[in-house]
Amino acid sequence: MENRWQVMIVWQVDRMRIRTWKSLVKHHMYVSGKARGWFYRHHYESPHPRISSEVHIPLGDARLVITTYWGLHTGERDWHLGQGVSIEWRKKRYSTQVDPELADQLIHLYYFDCFSDSAIRKALLGHIVSPRCEYQAGHNKVGSLQYLALAALITPKKIKPPLPSVTKLTEDRWNKPQKTKGHRGSHTMNGH
């Protein structure tokens, strides 16, 4: 029988970022209770030797599975050190990989309070609304002018510790373009 290869997208992440993310997930599962229904699988519960952990996040009748890996081939930089993360959306027998931004949006659909567009309508009708969004990572678009105006009136409350963002977990903090000052010293430009 010949070898069968399965190719997966694995985001290279440094070890400390993975540790921080796991810690945030466990805190919100066991202490704050904001991640009710999430399931954390340790490395010793997995039959695969390269899997460091898995977090299963129920999304209705589907689920999001964030798997962290160790012992992979090192990346192009010394600090990659063979650590990585894959993000998978599963429903029954179907599964597909998703990017970190979409994962954060899916999580936000089901978890964490949000001051959303519906809050504007509720406020006009005199109903009590949640005055802030607890999970800013789930928003990657600019809101309506009404939403921005109402959101500007209410200062967001800082949540300690922050909620676990998949985008934050997979972002490349070393290869971001360096910001330099413009001609007058006040404007910023991205590497130009």
UniProtKB/Swiss-Prot annotation:
Outline the segment boundaries, as ranges, of region: Interaction with host APOBEC3F and APOBEC3G: 54-72
For the region Disordered, give the residue spans: 164-192
What positions carry the motif HCCH motif? 108-139
**Region of interest called Interaction with host APOBEC3F, as start-end residue ranges on this chain:** 14-17, 74-79
Where can the motif BC-box-like motif be found? 144-153
* Stretch list, region RNA-binding: 75-114
- Supply the InterPro entries for this chain: Vif (IPR000475)
- Region (Multimerization) location: 151-164
Region feature (SOCS box-like): 151-180
Single GO cellular component annotation? host cell cytoplasm
- Provide the effect of D104N: Does not affect viral infectivity
Principal location class: host cell
For the keyword Zinc, the answer is yes
User: Which ranges are annotated Basic residues under compositional bias?
Assistant: 176-186
Task: Note down the stretches annotated as region Membrane association.
Answer: 171-172
Q: How the protein sits in the membrane?
A: Peripheral membrane protein
In the record, the note on similarity to other proteins reads: Belongs to the primate lentivirus group Vif protein family.
Q: How does it assemble?
A: Homomultimer; in vitro and presumably in vivo. Interacts with viral RNA and Pr55Gag precursor; these interactions mediate Vif incorporation into the virion. Interacts with the viral reverse transcriptase. Forms cullin-5-RING E3 ubiquitin-protein ligase complex (ECS complex) by interacting with host CUL5, RBX2, elongin BC complex (ELOB and ELOC) and CBFB/CBF-beta. Within the ECS complex, Vif interacts directly with host CUL5, ELOC and APOBEC (APOBEC3F and APOBEC3G) substrates.
Name by which UniProt lists this protein: Virion infectivity factor
